[in-house]
């Protein structure tokens, strides 16, 4: 903390002194603040590569930023080999967004075509025709 004391200010060229009720005031740091600033830290803070989950090395940018072309590890697959073979074989064509979108559009279109073709034709009121005899309106007209 700083304490305000009435002392003779040092004239600094280009800076005007502050005046409160005619006295020039200068800011002098408290003795506690002086002690804190003169102390040295007990230990320097050093982050080593890989220590405490801090991974940063300018010499090894590949490991620092990650291998962007590699999305897995070299560990063996935790899945059943038959399951892995199935997904590699049959899900291979759908790895691209465009192919997956085309597959979904074709599947959805064929589903709509099948449902509309297999629906009974008399669902629409125009196909069913009138079910009850017409009732006359308020003036006796149909």
Swiss-Prot record:
Record-annotated membrane-spanning stretches: 101-119
Keyword tRNA processing: no
Secretion signal span: none
Membrane topology: Single-pass membrane protein
Transit peptide limits: 1-47
GO cellular component, one term: photosystem I reaction center
InterPro entries named among the record's database cross-references: PSI_PsaH (IPR004928)
UniProt family annotation: Belongs to the psaH family.
Domain of life of the organism encoding this protein: Eukaryota
Function noted in UniProt: Possible role could be the docking of the LHC I antenna complex to the core complex.
Biological processes, Gene Ontology terms: photosynthesis
Main location class: plastid
Keywords, sorted A to Z: Chloroplast, Membrane, Photosynthesis, Photosystem I, Plastid, Thylakoid, Transit peptide, Transmembrane, Transmembrane helix
Annotated protein name in UniProt: Photosystem I reaction center subunit VI, chloroplastic
Localization per record: Plastid, Chloroplast thylakoid membrane
Matches recorded under Pfam families: PSI_PsaH
């Amino acid at each position: 903390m700083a304490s305000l004391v009435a002392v003779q200010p040092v004239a600094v060229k280009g800076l005007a002194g502050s005046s409160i009720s005619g006295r020039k005031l200068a800011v002098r740091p408290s003795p506690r603040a002086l002690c804190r600033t003169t102390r040295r830290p007990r230990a320097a803070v050093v982050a080593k590569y890989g220590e405490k989950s801090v991974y940063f090395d300018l010499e090894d940018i590949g490991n620092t930023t990650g291998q962007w072309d590699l999305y897995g590890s070299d560990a063996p697959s935790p899945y059943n080999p038959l399951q892995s073979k199935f997904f590699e074989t049959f899900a291979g064509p759908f790895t691209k967004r465009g192919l997956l979108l085309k597959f979904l559009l074709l599947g959805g279109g064929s589903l709509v075509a099948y449902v509309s073709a297999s629906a009974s034709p008399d669902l629409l009121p125009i196909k069913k025709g009138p079910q009850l005899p017409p009732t006359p309106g308020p003036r006796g007209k149909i």
